């Protein structure tokens, strides 16, 4: 497994220069920097090639995450919205190919966060999303990108709340590059048993996000990391494990993620760096170290 972190751990806004974090995450002991597709909307090919070179020179893999807005909703009943969404993803996937990014994950089958003041048509949205994700998934395949559908908690999304729903959805899409993405923060809310959810995903699991129940760094809370790591080992998962911690309030990030208090305990950038380095070292040991015992999940 390779271990990464999402750039927004250090940021209060989404649309920033994310290149600055390539060397930082390398120095802190990570293999991966996950970037937001938001910054790719208005970026030149030269800028993409510069970022690709920086990552390659540093020995850092890039992955991409995104929470699409309502105008990029593949489940929409409005044909113009769907047309716009497919055009958006086509553009983004071609840019990911230039960046040598092979994984995109997020609520990229609907939109985020959902506006629950409007009526929800889950059955209709499901059918539309399956058809349109099938189209986009084939484009992803042509670009060498796995299109990973994140299972979200009920407060942020409604189409895919459990791994069982995601597995059914992915089976209906039936495109090899369309995979399941699980996130321990969301799983902790919706899954009866996180280990069973991971086992159910099996070889359809394409991307894995980690964070504590309150979105702090792994090791800062009470998540059953040994059991989670054991389940990943049991299914032979050897892909990416990316931390998505959100610990600072304020700005667009804090508002969108609903961080209303300082979970960093007043940490400056140096303290944030030290905490991240300690967390990835902890997770490497728990998930792949000598104490990893997954016999209990194979009963």
Describe these PLM feature segments.
Residues 34-56, 108-117:
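Glycine-rich, proline-tolerant flexible connector loops at the mouths of alpha/beta enzymes
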Residues 1-9, 63-76, 108-117:
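N-terminal small/glycine-rich loop or linker at the start of catalytic domains
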Residues 1-11, 16-26, 100, 160-182, ...:
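Histidine-acidic metal/acid-base catalytic patches
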Residues 9-11, 37-39, 68-70, 108-112, ...:
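Active-site-proximal loop/turn and secondary-structure-junction residues that shape catalytic pockets
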Residues 43-62, 145, 253-266:
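Short acidic, glycine/proline-enriched helix-loop-strand junctions
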Residues 15-17, 56-57, 76-179, 191, ...:
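Active-site acidic/histidine proton-transfer and metal-coordination neighborhood
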Residues 18-39, 92, 98-100:
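Catalytic domains of carbohydrate-active enzymes, especially glycoside hydrolases
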Residues 34, 64, 105, 148, ...:
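Conserved beta-strand positions in the central sheet of alpha/beta enzyme cores
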């Amino acid at each position: 497994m390779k271990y990464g972190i999402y750039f927004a751990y250090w940021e209060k806004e989404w649309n920033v220069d994310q290149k600055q974090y390539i060397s930082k995450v390398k120095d802190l002991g990570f293999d991966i920097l996950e970037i937001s597709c938001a910054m790719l909307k208005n970026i030149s090919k030269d800028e993409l090639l510069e970022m690709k070179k920086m990552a390659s020179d540093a020995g850092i893999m890039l992955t991409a995450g995104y929470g699409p807005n309502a105008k990029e909703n593949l489940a929409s009943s409005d044909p113009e919205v769907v047309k716009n969404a497919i055009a958006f993803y086509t553009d983004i996937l071609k840019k990911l190919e230039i960046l040598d990014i092979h994984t995109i994950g997020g609520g990229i089958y609907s939109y985020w966060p959902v506006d629950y003041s409007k009526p929800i048509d889950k059955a209709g949205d499901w059918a539309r999303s399956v058809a349109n994700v099938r189209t986009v998934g084939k484009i992803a395949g042509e670009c060498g990108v796995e299109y990973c559908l994140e299972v979200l908690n009920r407060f942020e999304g409604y189409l895919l709340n459990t791994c069982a729903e995601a597995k059914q959805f992915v089976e209906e899409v039936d495109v090899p590059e369309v995979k399941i993405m699980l996130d321990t923060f969301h799983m902790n809310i919706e899954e009866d048993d996180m280990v069973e959810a991971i086992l159910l995903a099996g070889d359809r699991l394409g991307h894995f996000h980690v964070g504590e129940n309150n979105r702090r760094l792994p090791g800062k809370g009470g998540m059953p990391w040994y059991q989670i790591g054991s389940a990943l080992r049991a299914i032979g998962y050897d892909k990416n494990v990316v931390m998505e911690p959100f610990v600072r309030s304020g700005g667009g990030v804090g508002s969108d993620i609903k961080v209303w208090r300082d979970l960093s305990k007043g940490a400056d950038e140096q303290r944030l760096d030290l905490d991240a380095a300690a967390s990835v070292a902890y997770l490497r040991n728990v998930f792949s170290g000598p104490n990893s015992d997954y016999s209990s999940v194979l009963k």
